[in-house]
Curated annotation (Swiss-Prot):
Keywords attached to this entry: Disulfide bond, Endoplasmic reticulum, Glycoprotein, Glycosyltransferase, Golgi apparatus, Manganese, Membrane, Metal-binding, Signal-anchor, Transferase, Transmembrane, Transmembrane helix
The EC number(s) this enzyme carries: 2.4.1.225
Catalysed reaction equations from the record: 3-O-{alpha-D-GlcNAc-[(1->4)-beta-D-GlcA-(1->4)-alpha-D-GlcNAc](n)-(1->4)-beta-D-GlcA-(1->3)-beta-D-Gal-(1->3)-beta-D-Gal-(1->4)-beta-D-Xyl}-L-seryl-[protein] + UDP-alpha-D-glucuronate = 3-O-{[(1->4)-beta-D-GlcA-(1->4)-alpha-D-GlcNAc](n+1)-(1->4)-beta-D-GlcA-(1->3)-beta-D-Gal-(1->3)-beta-D-Gal-(1->4)-beta-D-Xyl}-L-seryl-[protein] + UDP + H(+)
One CC-aspect GO term: endoplasmic reticulum membrane
Protein name: Exostosin-1
Gene that encodes the chain: EXT1
Amino acid sequence: MQAKKRYFILLSAGSCLALLFYFGGLQFRASRSHSRREEHSGRNGLHHPSPDHFWPRFPDALRPFVPWDQLENEDSSVHISPRQKRDANSSIYKGKKCRMESCFDFTLCKKNGFKVYVYPQQKGEKIAESYQNILAAIEGSRFYTSDPSQACLFVLSLDTLDRDQLSPQYVHNLRSKVQSLHLWNNGRNHLIFNLYSGTWPDYTEDVGFDIGQAMLAKASISTENFRPNFDVSIPLFSKDHPRTGGERGFLKFNTIPPLRKYMLVFKGKRYLTGIGSDTRNALYHVHNGEDVVLLTTCKHGKDWQKHKDSRCDRDNTEYEKYDYREMLHNATFCLVPRGRRLGSFRFLEALQAACVPVMLSNGWELPFSEVINWNQAAVIGDERLLLQIPSTIRSIHQDKILALRQQTQFLWEAYFSSVEKIVLTTLEIIQDRIFKHISRNSLIWNKHPGGLFVLPQYSSYLGDFPYYYANLGLKPPSKFTAVIHAVTPLVSQSQPVLKLLVAAAKSQYCAQIIVLWNCDKPLPAKHRWPATAVPVIVIEGESKVMSSRFLPYDNIITDAVLSLDEDTVLSTTEVDFAFTVWQSFPERIVGYPARSHFWDNSKERWGYTSKWTNDYSMVLTGAAIYHKYYHYLYSHYLPASLKNMVDQLANCEDILMNFLVSAVTKLPPIKVTQKKQYKETMMGQTSRASRWADPDHFAQRQSCMNTFASWFGYMPLIHSQMRLDPVLFKDQVSILRKKYRDIERL
């Protein structure tokens, strides 16, 4: 027994020695071989770095701040061929590790704010219409500056949208043209727009020139190549996409249950070979010809017949039987499979048609995914699970379908209906990254009215906006500030402006009164103003222009504003009733004088009317209540050209405010009571208030309507037939039972 133990110990020791010798010998030979190579390299003037050499070394204090991709390129540039260098320089992925923190200079923005500079167009350079629309949207925005020294962001005038070498829109020698720009600075603080990249057969995401440290606003970008918090994914849109405005969504009313004729539809090309063909070639497995109609055609391209298969003739025949628009408007879900590239025109078409998109494009970074929650508006599928799509969408509850459909309409109208909205959304996302302390949150981006109309510079608290009271569980304000616009001198104690001031001050909801003195005469003495129970603040306008009545004055301490012309005739009861109505509709204009617009077929232009009809689309701000945020929006969102027009004409400011509020809310204003005459008829004809009797005044308002509609790109005003009266208004009951009894006698 002892002998066996000794033999076992001896055998184990021998095995250990053998293993030690084997591995030790290998390491020794490897080190000797390595030393011989170093010696041989030294004789031939070559140097092979040790593995430690590939780790970045920082010879000075600033070296650690060099982007990592630049370090890697510097360390390995010696060991790649010239062709590999060219490929690397022209690749989209060179700055793949760029982020705002490493490849963007924030100091330019903190100094002058978020301003965007567009390079002047170079002589002889052709620009496609789509790119012209992008540049026009930037130049027409509040972010634009013509001074590069004031700019925070730079946009090329060179057309970078189509980088498919087979396209007639392809711009040659773009690399040298970009490098010659004196402000290029390796792309730092630059934004490059791109819709198409790569070409047949693999359609890579290479844009064909070195973008350096520039950001990409790119369509069909993959999650693999998307640089989070740096690039912006934009939708693929056609050359016919409107520059401004755009059509509204096609959902006119909600149907319960929210099911349509077809459950799932698709009509498009079937790629017989190459990238993107796998999914579309398999769609026939899901098509049932009843409520799931997925149609493809082989008829596209020059040589489709060379590659046609046994199904092509049957597919082409069935493809012609269905009208695409009819399918789109009568389907609950629309399939959006990838094409040659990840993005597809079908995406925006489905959104507009209120057809819930079913995404089948693995690896696609969805448009504006940084701020939009697409799970609220689309079904994200998987190309590998195509056969499970029908059963998946059938299992979605009707309540969820209705919510998805409504969200498609909101997103379409807020961010995608025009090139301008796509561009402005891109810029707002970048601005939020720069000024994170006042950036918009997810609720703002994904709830009405959307991120473009909610300016965080106004406030970082959602309760200061009129759109989120229900979300926050808040009640609308309980007090208002009356702002009286005075343009005539105070010569008599019986003037309408003094009567109006007293009537407003007696309201139980009035917190203060501000008189905006836009008269050429000096301010009257304090004793000329009547004594009231609330503070009266008189502000003398510096410029004395019409737009000054909508400036966001710090003196306005309440969220509600009662806007009044000096010759308005209102009683305290009318003021109280209008305010209580506004508390139920804090995002709208609520008031008394109603006007309407119409389309004049003979003149092919918009018309303005003050006739008493069965509907209206405007409530004039001479006697109306609205949220004070609209003062800020009027001053900071609208372009200077429209405000200058208003000031030059001394007219149309009330129309412009109605345009703005309707564009934001997508809702009409609200008229209260049947009162039609709200102006004092005994005003002196020599006063500025007599402009209402001027025939040119009405003609100017007609012209304003069309100018405003042109800037918005569509007519935002919406007709309404609703009028709100007090309960028991003119009912045959005792007057003592009525709360607003004085209104019936007015």
